[in-house]
UniProtKB/Swiss-Prot annotation:
Entry protein name: Chromosome partition protein MukB
Pfam families: MukB, MukB_hinge, SbcC_Walker_B
This protein's UniProt keywords: ATP-binding, Cell cycle, Cell division, Chromosome partition, Coiled coil, Cytoplasm, DNA condensation, DNA-binding, Nucleotide-binding
Amino acids binding ATP: G34, G35, N36, G37, A38, G39, K40, S41
Length: 1491
C-alpha cells in the first residue's frame, strides 16, 4: 500500500524570537502551547509562508482582525522578521520516501510599504543526518553562528553529495514542483488556484465556518469537467469556425464585385495619379530644360544689351559731361563775344570821347592861355589904371602941394635908385649881366619852378631825415618783410628790392586776372583733344572690327556705301531664311498631327497588346495572328471539359471517404449513430466503449470473437428491457443486448476458441459462429484510429487532387473567359502595327525638324547680329564724318603745351601770391620806410644841408628877382632925378604930366574895361570848356572803368576770334546734342528691350525656379514613390503606358471619379479610410502608393492564404473563386458531421450531474460519524436548480419546439442554449451578460447544482450550517470537517494529474484551539487519525492534548534581545503503532542474542 507523504519538520531562521529553530511535525497533531505573544502565530505564519510564498495573499492577523480589511500595513509578516536574511523551510518525506526541503528566503525591503522579498527554492536529496539548520546556518564558533545568504546555501548544498539546490523564478513553478512531489493536494496553475488554497488554509487557521468557502463550495468541491466542456467547446468552435468560414466565403462571394471594384478603382485612382505625376514630371523636366535654355540665352542677350547700355551710358555720361562743358564754354564764348563787342563799342566810345576830350583839352588849353593872357592884360590894365590913377592923383596932389610934389619926386628918385640897385644885385647874384627888368619876370617864373622842385627834394630829404631819425623800428620791420620774401638782402638794396617785389606781385595779380580766360582755353583745347582721341578711338575700333583704316573722309564715304550694300544683302538672306523656317514649321505641324493621331490610338493598342501578352503567358502559345487565337481558344474549351469530368470523379471518391471516416469517428465506431442514444435510454454502455482501450494487437481477436455483437449494448440487468424496447420509436434492425457489470465486464459469457486467424464461438448447443480475423480491425479505439489515420491520409490526397483538379478546371475556365474577352474587345487592334514605334519615329523626325528650325533661327539671329553690326558701323561712320578734321590736327598739342606753360606761370603766380601775398601787402604799406636807412643818417643830413644851402641861395636869387620885379615900375621914375635938378620947370611939367596922366588914365580905364569884358567872356568860355572837359573826362573814366570791369582786351582780332570760337563751340554743341539724342534713343530702346527682356527673364526665371524646385522636390518624392512601388511590386500595375497619352485633366478626372467611388467602398474600413484620406494630399504622391499598398495588403489579409496559392490579390480573387464552391460543399458536409443534438447535450449534462451526486454522497459517508458538541453529523446537500432542470427538460423532451434555435445558422450552440434558457425562464433577469457568455456557463454542469452544508444538531435535526446557529467549538469543528472534505475532493480530482505512486500530504491548521472542548479536540484527533491527516494547532498553556507532540513556547527577554524558549514533549496518551511481523521477528532475534 502506498503511504501518504508527511511533513517532517518546520525550520525557522532569523525570525522574531527564533534564530534557528526546527519544529518536528507530528504524524497526527502538533500543538504549540504558550501564553499570549509566545510565538505560536509566528510559527504558523512561517509554515504558511513556506507553503504559499505569495505576498499578495499572505495576511497574518489575530482573531480580532478576522474579516477586517483595515489590518496592519505589513500584513503581519514584515514585523515577524529580523533584519537580514530569514528562512522558513518545510522538511517533507513523500510517498516515494524522498526527502524534500521546500524553503523560502525572506528579507525585509526598506520603505514605507514594509514589503518583504520572498525567494522560494528546493533542496532535494539531503542525507537524513543533515539538519536543515546545518545548511541554512553557518557555525562560526561554539557560541556564534551566522545566517547564510542564498548563494552560500547553494554552495553548501553543492558540497553535499547527492544533494541538489533548485531556485524558482515564479510561484507557479514552486507549486508545480510541490504538486509533483505530493506536498500539496491540488495543482495550483494560477493565482486563482493559489487564492483558493490560501483561503482554505486561512479558514482552517482561524477556525469556524468560512463564508468565503461555503458560498463557493461548487468551485472547491465540484471538479471542472474540462473534457465535457472542451468537447462542447471544440464542437461549437468547429461549428462556429465552419459557419464563420462559410459566411466569410459567402461574404467573399458577395463582395467579389466589391473587391474587383476596389482594385479597379484604387488602380485607376493611384495609377492615374501615378502616370499624371510621371507625365507631369516628364513635361516639367522638358519645360525646365526649355526655360533654362531660354533663360541662358536671355541672360546672354541681357548681358550683351547691358554691356551695350553701359557703353552707351559711359559715352553718354562723357558726352553729357563734355556737352555741359561745351555749353559752359559756348555760353562763356557767347558772353565773351558779347563782352568783346561791348568792349569794342565801349572802346569806340572811349576813343570818340578821347578825341572830343583831346579837342576840348586843346581848346581848354588854348582858352586857358587866352584867359591867362586876358588876365595878364587885365592885371596890367588894372596896374596901369591904378598907376594912372595914382599918377593923376599924385600929379594933382603935387600940383596942389608943390613941396609934397617935391617930396614925391624925391621919393621917386630914391625908388628909382633902389630899383637900379636891385637890378645890379640881381645881376650879381644871378651872374647874369644881361638881366633887365623886363626879362626878370620869365626868369623869376623859372626860378620859382626850380624852387618848388628843390623845396620838394628838400622836404623829401627832410622827411627821410625825420623818418630815419624817428622810425628805425619801422625800417627794421619792413626790412624783415623783404627778407621774408627774398631771403638775405643788403640793407642798401632793401628799398629797391622791395619796389621790385611789389612790382612782381602786381604783375602776378595781372597774370591772375587771365586765369578764367586761360582755363577756358585749356578746357576748349582739352575737349578738342578728347574729341580727337575719341575720333581716333572710333577709327581704331572700326579698324579692329572691320579691318579698314579710316584715314580721310573719302574712306569714310566708301565704307558707308559698302555697309549700305551689305545691309541690303543681309536683309535678303534674312527673308530667305524666314521662308525656309516657315516651310519647316509647316512640316513640323504635319508631324505633330501624326503624333496626335498615334497618341490617340496608342492606348487601345497598348491595352490590346497587354491582353495579348497576358494570354500568351497564360496559354504558353505564340498567338501570332487572330486565326491562332481562335484555334487555341477551341483547344482550351476541350481541355476544360475533360478536367471537369476528372474533378467530378474525385469528388465522388472524397464523399465515400468522408462517410467512412465519419462512421469510424463516432463513439464505438458503430455504423448506426442511434446506438449511443439507445444505450443512454436503456441505462447501458456500448460494448465498444468498454473495449475502447484494447491494444491494436488484440483488436482482431475481439472483433472476430464478438462478431455482429461488437456493437452491442451492455446493461446491468436484462429484466424490464423488453418493455423499454417495445417503447422505442427509432431502432436499428439488429440490436444486441448483453447483461454484465459495466465496471467489471468480462467475456466469460462467451465460449470462444481461437483458431489460426479466426475465432470459433459456441453460441449454444445448436449454434456456432466462425469469424475470421478482419484484415482491417475496427474494434477498439487504437484500431479505429489506425484505420482513421490511413483513411484521412487517403482523403487528404484525394482532397488535394480534387483541389488541384478544381483549380486547373477553374484556371482553364478563366483562360477561356480571357480568350472570349480578348476576342470581343481587342482582336481588331491587337495585331496592328505598333503605334508607339511609329510615334517614336515621328518624334525623332519632329526633333530633327526642330533642330533644323533652331539652326535657321540661329542663322537668322546671326544675320540679325550682322545687320546690327552694319547698322552700328554706319552709326559710327556718321559719328566720325563730321569730326574727321580733328583726326589730322597736329597743332592742338602744341597749343595745349603753350597754354600749359601759361597755366604753369599762373600756378607759380598763384603760389607766389599764396605764399607772399599778405607779406607783400604789409610791405607795400611800409615800403617808404626803406628809403631812409637809419644807418645813413649823416650822409642824409649832409645831403640835406647842401640841398638847404642851394635852396637858400635860390631863394636869395628869387628874392632879388622879386625885389627887382616889385621895383620894376620904379624904373619909370628916372625923370624924377632930373626933376630934382630942374625944380622951376617942375610945375609946368607937372601940369603937362597931369594932362598926360589923365588921358593915360582914361585910356587905361577903357583898356581895363575892355580887358575885363574880354576876360569875362574868356572865363565863361573857359568854364563851359572846363565843365565839358570834366564831364567828358568823367565819362571816359567811367567807360574805362567799365572796360576794365569787362576784363577783356579789346583789339581788332578779338571779336573775330570770339566769333570764330563761339561758332566752333556752337557747331560742336549741336553735334554733341545730336549724338546725345542718338544715344538717348539708343538707351531708351535698349532699356525698353532690356526691361521687356528682364520682365520676361524674371518670369522665365521664376517659372524656371518654380519648375526646378518642383522637379527637385518632386524628384525625392518621385524616388520614394518609385522605391515604394518597386519594393512592394506594384510598379507594373501602376505604370500603365496607355495612361501616358491622356492629358492631366483627363487623368485628374479619372482619379477624382475613382476617389469618389473609393470613399464609398472604404467607408466601413477605418484603416483604408484613413489611408485614403491621407492619400488625398496632392503634395505627397507617395501616400497614394501607400494607399494602394494598403489596399493590396488589406486584400491579402482578407483572402485566406491556406486555400490560395498566390500573394497577388487580383490573382487571389480569381483563384478564390475556384475554391469557393469546393469549400462551401466541404464546410456544409463538415457541419452536418459535427452537428450535435440538444438531446445528447442534456444527456451528457445529466450523467455528469449524477456522477458528481454519487461522489458527494461518498464524501458524506466519511463525515457521517463526526460530532462536535451538539453536532452529531455533517453532510453536503446537492440539488439541481429548478430553472436549469426546466432547461434540461426543454433540451431533451421539447426538441421540436426549439428547432428554430439549434438549427439556425445565426446562433452558435452556446447562444442557442442561452436563448432557450431565456425562453423557458422568462421570469429570470439575465443582467448584462451576453448570450454567448450565458451559453458557455450553461455548458458547465456546476452551474446546474446548488451545494449547502447541513449539520445534525441535537433535537433540531438537519439544519443549514451557519455560524450564528452553532457554538464556537461546533462551528470550528464543522468548518474543519468541510475543509477536510474539500481537501479530499481535491485529491480525488487531481489523482489523474499526478503519478500513481504519489499520495499527497494532508495538513490543516487551527489557531486558538482553546475554543474547543476536550471532546471536540479528541474528535479532531480521531478525524485526523481516520483520514491520515496532520494537524497543527495553537493552544494556551492550560491545554495539553493527550496525543501528538506538544511544544511549550515561552518568550524571554534578555537585555534588548528576545528569545523564545521551546520545550517539546510527546503526548502522554500516545499509543504505539501496531508492530509489523517483521518488527516482531526482529525483536525476538534481538532477545535471543541478549540471552
Amino acid at each position: 500500500m502506498i503511504e501518504r507523504g508527511k511533513y517532517q519538520s518546520l525550520t525557522m531562521i532569523n525570525w522574531n524570537g527564533f534564530f534557528a529553530r526546527t519544529f518536528d511535525i507530528d504524524n497526527l497533531v502538533t500543538t504549540l502551547s504558550g501564553g499570549n505573544g509566545a510565538g505560536k502565530s509566528t510559527t504558523m505564519a512561517a509554515f504558511i509562508t513556506a507553503l504559499i510564498p505569495d505576498q499578495s495573499l499572505l495576511h497574518f492577523r489575530n482573531t480580532t482582525e478576522a474579516g477586517s480589511s483595515q489590518a496592519s500595513r505589513d500584513k503581519g509578516l514584515y514585523g515577524k522578521l529580523q533584519a537580514g536574511a530569514c528562512y522558513a523551510a518545510l522538511d517533507v518525506v513523500n510517498s516515494r520516501n524522498q526527502r524534500l526541503l521546500f524553503a523560502v528566503k525572506l528579507q525585509q525591503v526598506a520603505g514605507r510599504d514594509k514589503k518583504v522579498d520572498i525567494k522560494p527554492f528546493l533542496i532535494q536529496g539531503l542525507p537524513s543526518h543533515v539538519k536543515p539548520t546545518d545548511v541554512l546556518v553557518e557555525t562560526v564558533s561554539d557560541k556564534h553562528a551566522r545566517v547564510r545568504q542564498i548563494n552560500e546555501v547553494k554552495d553548501a548544498v553543492g558540497q553535499i553529495e547527492g544533494a541538489h539546490f533548485k531556485s524558482f523564478p515564479s510561484i507557479v513553478d514552486y507549486h508545480a514542483q510541490m504538486f509533483e512531489f505530493g506536498v500539496i493536494p491540488k495543482k495550483l496553475r494560477n493565482s486563482s488556484d493559489r487564492s483558493k488554497f490560501y483561503r482554505l488554509i486561512e479558514a482552517s487557521l482561524y477556525g469556524g465556518i468560512s463564508s468565503a468557502i461555503t458560498r463557493s463550495l461548487r468551485d472547491y468541491l465540484l471538479p471542472q469537467n474540462g473534457g465535457v466542456k472542451k468537447a462542447f467547446q471544440d464542437m461549437e468552435s468547429a461549428l462556429r469556425e465552419n459557419r464563420m468560414t462559410l459566411e466569410a466565403i459567402k461574404t467573399t462571394q458577395a463582395d467579389r464585385d466589391l473587391f474587383k471594384h476596389l482594385i479597379t478603382e484604387s488602380t485607376n485612382y493611384v495609377a492615374a495619379d501615378y502616370m499624371r505625376h510621371a507625365n507631369d514630371r516628364r513635361n516639367k523636366v522638358g519645360q525646365t530644360l526649355v526655360l533654362r535654355g531660354e533663360l541662358f540665352s536671355s541672360r546672354e542677350t541681357l548681358i550683351e544689351q547691358n554691356s551695350l547700355l553701359n557703353r552707351v551710358h559711359e559715352e553718354l555720361e562723357l558726352l553729357v559731361e563734355q556737352e555741359s562743358a561745351l555749353e559752359q564754354d559756348y555760353q562763356g564764348a557767347s558772353d565773351h563775344l558779347q563782352l568783346v563787342q561791348n568792349a569794342l563799342r565801349q572802346q569806340e566810345k572811349i576813343e570818340r570821347y578821347q578825341e572830343d576830350l583831346e579837342e576840348l583839352n586843346f581848346r581848354l588849353e588854348e582858352q586857358m592861355m587866352v584867359v591867362e593872357e586876358a588876365n595878364e592884360r587885365v592885371m596890367m590894365a588894372e596896374e596901369r589904371a591904378t598907376i594912372s590913377e595914382e599918377e593923376v592923383d599924385s600929379l594933382k596932389s603935387q600940383l596942389a602941394d608943390y613941396q609934397q610934389a617935391l617930396d614925391v619926386q624925391q621919393t621917386r628918385a630914391l625908388q628909382y635908385q633902389q630899383a637900379v640897385q636891385a637890378l645890379d644885385k640881381a645881376r650879381r647874384l644871378l651872374d647874369k649881366p644881361e638881366l633887365t627888368a623886363e626879362s626878370a619876370q620869365a626868369l623869376a617864373t623859372q626860378l620859382k619852378a626850380e624852387q618848388e622842385t628843390r623845396t620838394s627834394e628838400l622836404l623829401a630829404l627832410k622827411h627821410k631825415l625825420d623818418m630815419s631819425s624817428a622810425a628805425a623800428q619801422q625800417f627794421n620791420h619792413a626790412f624783415d618783410l623783404v627778407k621774408r620774401v627774398l631771403g638775405e638782402v643788403a640793407r642798401s638794396e632793401a628799398s629797391k628790392q622791395a619796389q621790385q617785389v611789389i612790382r612782381q606781385a602786381r604783375e602776378a595779380q595781372n597774370v591772375l586776372q587771365n586765369e578764367a580766360q586761360w582755363q577756358a582755353q585749356q578746357r576748349d583745347l582739352e575737349r578738342q583733344l578728347e574729341q580727337q582721341r575719341s575720333v581716333r578711338e572710333l577709327a581704331t575700333q572700326y579698324h579692329k572690327q572691320h579691318m579698314v583704316a579710316l584715314d580721310d573722309a573719302a574712306t569714310v564715304e566708301l565704307e558707308r556705301e559698302r555697309h549700305s550694300a551689305l545691309l541690303e544683302e543681309l536683309e535678303t538672306e534674312q527673308e530667305n531664311c524666314r521662308e525656309q523656317r516657315g516651310q519647316l514649321r509647316h512640316q513640323e505641324q504635319e508631324l505633330q498631327t501624326q503624333i496626335a493621331r498615334f497618341e490617340s490610338i496608342a492606348p487601345a493598342w497598348i491595352k490590346a497588346n497587354d491582353a495579348l501578352e497576358t494570354l500568351r503567358e497564360q496559354s504558353g502559345a505564340e498567338l501570332a495572328d487572330s486565326q491562332s487565337v481562335m484555334a487555341h481558344m477551341q483547344q482550351v474549351l476541350e481541355l476544360e471539359k475533360a478536367q471537369s469530368m476528372a474533378k467530378d470523379k474525385l469528388a465522388e471518391r472524397r464523399a465515400k471517404l468522408d462517410s467512412e471516416i465519419e462512421r469510424l469517428a463516432s463513439p464505438g465506431g458503430s455504423n448506426d449513430p442511434r446506438l449511443k442514444g439507445l444505450a443512454d435510454t436503456l441505462g447501458g454502455v456500448l460494448l465498444s466503449e468498454i473495449y475502447d482501450d484494447i491494444t491494436i494487437d488484440d483488436a482482431p481477436y475481439f472483433s472476430a470473437m464478438y462478431g455482429p455483437a461488437r456493437h452491442a449494448i451492455v446493461v446491468s440487468d436484462l429484466s424490464g428491457i423488453k418493455e423499454k424496447l417495445v417503447e422505442l420509436d427509432d431502432c436499428p434492425e439488429d440490436l444486441y443486448l448483453i447483461e454484465g457489470d459495466v465496471d467489471a465486464f468480462d467475456d466469460s459469457s462467451f465460449n470462444a476458441e481461437e483458431l489460426e486467424g479466426a475465432v470459433c464461438v459456441q453460441l449454444n448447443q445448436r449454434q456456432m459462429r466462425y469469424s475470421r480475423f478482419p484484415a482491417i480491425p475496427l474494434f477498439g479505439r487504437a484500431a479505429r484510429e489506425q484505420r482513421l489515420e490511413l483513411l484521412r491520409e487517403e482523403r487528404d490526397d484525394v482532397v488535394e487532387q480534387h483541389a488541384k483538379a478544381s483549380f486547373d478546371s477553374q484556371k482553364l475556365q478563366r483562360l477561356y473567359a480571357s480568350f472570349n474577352q480578348f476576342v470581343a474587345m481587342h482582336l481588331q487592334v491587337a495585331f496592328d502595327a505598333d503605334p508607339e514605334q511609329a510615334l517614336a519615329n515621328a518624334r525623332d523626325k519632329r526633333n530633327q525638324l526642330l533642330r533644323s528650325i533652331s539652326e535657321f533661327e540661329a542663322q537668322e539671329q546671326q544675320l540679325r547680329s550682322q545687320l546690327q553690326a552694319s547698322k552700328q558701323a554706319l552709326a559710327a561712320l556718321d559719328k566720325l564724318a563730321p569730326q574727321m578734321g580733328l583726326l589730322d590736327e597736329e597743332t592742338l598739342e602744341a597749343r595745349y603745351q603753350e597754354l600749359e606753360e601759361k597755366l604753369q606761370q599762373l600756378s607759380e603766380a598763384k603760389a607766389f601770391i599764396a605764399a607772399h601775398g599778405r607779406t607783400i601787402s604789409e610791405l607795400e604799406k611800409v615800403a617808404a620806410v626803406l628809403d631812409a636807412d637809419p644807418e645813413q643818417f649823416d650822409a642824409l643830413e649832409q645831403q640835406y644841408q647842401q640841398a638847404d644851402q642851394a635852396l637858400q641861395q635860390l631863394k636869395a636869387q628869387i628874392f632879388a628877382l622879386s625885389d627887382l620885379l616889385e621895383r620894376r615900375h620904379h624904373f619909370a621914375y628916372s625923370d624924377s632925378v632930373d626933376l630934382l635938378n630942374q625944380s622951376s620947370e617942375l610945375s609946368e611939367q607937372l601940369k603937362a604930366k597931369l594932362v598926360q596922366a589923365e588921358s593915360e588914365r582914361t585910356r587905361s580905364r577903357e583898356e581895363l574895361k575892355q580887358a575885363q569884358a574880354q576876360l569875362s567872356q574868356y572865363n565863361q568860355l573857359l568854364a563851359s570848356l572846363k565843365s565839358s572837359h570834366q564831364a567828358k573826362l568823367e565819362t571816359v573814366q567811367e567807360f574805362k572803368q567799365e572796360l576794365q570791369e569787362f576784363g577783356v582786351h579789346a583789339d581788332e582780332g578779338a571779336i573775330e576770334r570770339a566769333q570764330r570760337r563761339r561758332d566752333e563751340l556752337q557747331e560742336r554743341l549741336h553735334t554733341s546734342r545730336s549724338r546725345k539724342s542718338e544715344y538717348e534713343r539708343t538707351i531708351t530702346s535698349t532699356e525698353l528691350e532690356m526691361k521687356a527682356l528682364v520682365k520676361r527673364m524674371k518670369k522665365v526665371e521664376k517659372d524656371y525656379q518654380d519648375l526646378r524646385t518642383f522637379v527637385v522636390n518632386a524628384k525625392a518624392g518621385w524616388c520614394s514613390v518609385l522605391r515604394l512601388a518597386r519594393q512592394n511590386d506594384v510598379e507594373r500595375r501602376l505604370h500603365k503606358r496607355e495612361l501616358a497619352y491622356l492629358s492631366a485633366d483627363e487623368l485628374r478626372s479619372m482619379s477624382d471619379k475613382s476617389l469618389g467611388a473609393l470613399r464609398l467602398a472604404v467607408a466601413n474600413n477605418e484603416d483604408l479610410r484613413d489611408a485614403l484620406r491621407q492619400s488625398e494630399d496632392n503634395s505627397r504622391p507617395e501616400r497614394k502608393v501607400l494607399f494602394y499598398i494598403a489596399v493590396y495588403q488589406h486584400l491579402r489579409e482578407r483572402i485566406r492564404q491556406d486555400i490560395i496559392r498566390t500573394d497577388d490579390p487580383v490573382e487571389a480573387i480569381e483563384e478564390m473563386e475556384v475554391e469557393l464552391a469546393r469549400l462551401t460543399e466541404e464546410l456544409t458536409q463538415r457541419e452536418q458531421r459535427l452537428a450535435i443534438s440538444s438531446d445528447s447535450v442534456a444527456s451528457i449534462i445529466r450523467k455528469t450531474i449524477q456522477r458528481e451526486q454519487n461522489r458527494i454522497r461518498m464524501l458524506n459517508q466519511g463525515l457521517s460519524n463526526i460530532s462536535f458538541g451538539q453536532v452529531n453529523g455533517v453532510r453536503l446537500n446537492v440539488k439541481v436548480r429548478e430553472s436549469h432542470e426546466i432547461l434540461l427538460a426543454g433540451l431533451s423532451e421539447q426538441q421540436a419546439q426549439h428547432k428554430d434555435l439549434f438549427e439556425s445558422a445565426r446562433y452558435t450552440f452556446s447562444e442557442a442554449m442561452a436563448k432557450l434558457f431565456q425562453r423557458v425562464n422568462p421570469h429570470i433577469d439575465m443582467g448584462q451578460r451576453s448570450p454567448q457568455v450565458l451559453g458557455e456557463e450553461l455548458l458547465d454542469y456546476r452551474n446546474y447544482l446548488e451545494l449547502s452544508v447541513e449539520v445534525n444538531r441535537g433535537s433540531d435535526g438537519w439544519l443549514q450550517a451557519e455560524s450564528g446557529a452553532l457554538s464556537t467549538g461546533e462551528a470550528i469543528g464543522t468548518g474543519q470537517s468541510i475543509l477536510l472534505m474539500v481537501v479530499q475532493s481535491w485529491e480525488e480530482e487531481s489523482r489523474r494529474l499526478r503519478s500513481k505512486d504519489i499520495v499527497p500530504c494532508r495538513l490543516l491548521f487551527l489557531d486558538e484551539a482553546a475554543r474547543l472542548d476536550a471532546k471536540s479536540i479528541a474528535t479532531l484527533f480521531e478525524l485526523c487519525e481516520r483520514l491520515d491527516m496532520q494537524l497543527l494547532i495553537a493552544a494556551p498553556e492550560n491545554i495539553s492534548p493527550e496525543k501528538g507532540t506538544t511544544y511549550k513556547l515561552v518568550r524571554k527577554v534578555f537585555k534588548d534581545h528576545e528569545h523564545v524558549h521551546v520545550v517539546g514533549l510527546r503526548g502522554f496518551a500516545q499509543t504505539e503503532k501496531p508492530k509489523t511481523a517483521e518488527q516482531k521477528f526482529a525483536e525476538e532475534l534481538a532477545g535471543e542474542l541478549t540471552e
